Amino acid sequence: MAATAPPRPGNEIGRMTGLTLFTPIRRQWLPLLVLAFWMSWHAKVFNRHILQFNFIKFVRWTIVRDLPGEDLNYAYMLFESNFDGPWQHYIDAFAYVIPKDIRLTWGRGINFPHPPPAEPLKAWIARNSMEGGTYYCAYPEASTRMVRSALEVRKRVGALARDAERLGPEEFKAAYERFLVDAQAHL
């Protein structure tokens, strides 16, 4: 009898992984984080570092000051994200590409290891992460890049279809060949 495979964690579906962290924030740093999050929401230039990673499908930070029925000693930061591949690779990118952003966001928290290197950060995340209770991914077998490429091809096919109504056969042939060349990077 063949051994059964171990169950997959609830935060993995297809090639996607969800990561949820719930970490305390030191009181004296709460106003700085509130300001930083407000600025990132209202001035998108502050999001450019996190948005450079094309493997991220979703990312959100929330400051939690209270919970119904619970007296919290600290405000907490709830971090939620989903991305292509294992979380360890995701954290490598954070630790080495945007370490200042990571230190600003979590560096004022308790026992934060201040990357780089990535290994202490991974250990800290492993201690502070929570398995997702609910996790949804519309295209679990597709990477973020695949989904973005498919959306771009769909947009270009739509433009070609609109143009086709007014083009003659030779013009359409030329437009179709341009479409194939232009869309090639997304196929």
Where are these regions (language model features)?
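Short beta-strand
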Residues: I63
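An amphipathic, aromatic/His-enriched active-site/gating alpha helix that lines ligand/cofactor pockets
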Residues: D84-E119
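Short S/T/G/P-rich N-terminal loop/turn motif that feeds into the first structured element of a domain
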Residues: M1-K57, D66, N73-Y76, N82-H89, ...
